[in-house]
Swiss-Prot record:
It is found in: Cytoplasm. Its EC number is 2.1.3.3. The lineage of its organism: Bacteria, Pseudomonadati, Aquificota, Aquificia, Aquificales. GO terms for cellular component: cytoplasm. This is Ornithine carbamoyltransferase. Keywords: Amino-acid biosynthesis, Arginine biosynthesis, Cytoplasm, Transferase. GO terms for molecular function: amino acid binding; ornithine carbamoyltransferase activity. It comes from Aquifex aeolicus (strain VF5).
């Protein structure tokens, strides 16, 4: 039976932990993934621009022995009105898996439901599970098992990254404090899912509109762009108190690490000074997309055991 990765909860917490821990062994050279994609072709179907997601997946597919085909939506008949169900069923006859980056989460779920091959969410307006799985790996690589004792603060827009980070906190047992402007809170369904997972795994997720309250004594401060692709009409003024700058970080621990999923709009959600001070950690975070996604693909495309 095929496995999709449309939302983070398509993995059980146990499976997610296994991927994170295996990724560390592979990155250290203690374990090899081999060539699980040998003889396989993976399609990348993107409607949104991408640097890290596209390159990390294409390189990862190659390193796992597979071939990749990249398509923008405008190159396919779906852009002229073909039923998403028909596109999914057609591509499933040609390729062994599809990685989708699409504005609509509903569209992606419909595509996955009708595809007969594994489908991976490479970002929608609602969810970014590959990013958060990789981010948890970055924390695990740096802090080890202590990551469960960390205070992680997310400051900014309650967007797709924030939605999935909440779920990730619940699944991995992290303590997450989310601060967003009023009216820009994260999705209520993802918050509900995060609370459900938190009860099972010992984590916590708290929401506030006060950025100082969120970052107070934080070990990690995470931010993302205030204006995502296709959302250019936001009230930037409402976000100004949520900028990750030296003043805001003065309320966090002196050893605080800053995370950003990139691309960064320096001077908006984060200052140039803070970004450059934390550049090593931020670009390790970016690098880890490759390592984590390779382990994820090995898991999803693994041949079933007899």
């Amino acid at each position: 039976m095929k496995r999709d990765f449309v939302d983070l909860w398509d993995l059980s917490p146990k499976e997610a932990w296994e991927i994170v821990k295996k990724t560390l062994k592979v990155k250290k050279g203690e374990e090899e993934l081999g060539k699980p994609l040998s003889g396989k072709t993976i399609a990348l179907l993107f409607t949104k621009p991408s640097t890290r997601t596209r390159v990390s997946f294409e390189v990862g597919i190659y390193q796992l022995g597979g071939n990749s085909l990249f398509f923008q939506e405008k190159e396919l008949q779906v852009s002229r009105g073909e039923d998403v169900r028909d596109t999914a069923r057609t591509l499933s006859k040609y390729v062994d898996g599809v990685i989708v980056r699409n504005h609509s989460h509903t569209w992606l779920k419909e595509f996955a439901n009708f595809a007969s091959v594994p489908v991976i969410n490479a970002l929608t307006n609602m969810s970014h599970p590959c990013q958060i799985l990789s981010d948890v790996f970055t924390l695990y690589e740096h802090y080890g098992e202590e990551l469960k004792n960390l205070k992680v603060a997310y400051v900014g827009d309650g967007n797709n990254v924030c939605n999935t980070l909440m779920v990730g906190a619940g699944m991995f047992g992290l303590k997450l404090f989310v601060a967003t402007p009023e009216g820009y809170e994260p999705n209520s369904y993802y918050y509900k899912k995060a609370l459900e997972f938190s009860k099972e795994n010992g984590g916590s997720v708290e929401l506030t509109n006060n950025p100082v309250e969120s970052v107070k004594d934080a070990d990690v401060v995470y931010t993302d762009v205030w204006v995502s692709m296709g959302e250019e009409n936001k009230n930037i003024e409402a976000f100004l108190p949520y900028q990750v700058n030296e003043k805001l970080l003065s309320f966090a621990k002196s050893s605080v690490k800053v995370m950003h999923c990139l691309p960064a709009k320096k001077g908006q959600e984060i200052t140039e000074e803070v970004f450059e001070k934390n550049a090593d950690f931020i670009f390790t975070q970016a690098e880890n997309r490759l390592h984590t996604q390779k382990t994820l693909m090995e898991f999803l495309f693994r041949e079933p055991q007899a």
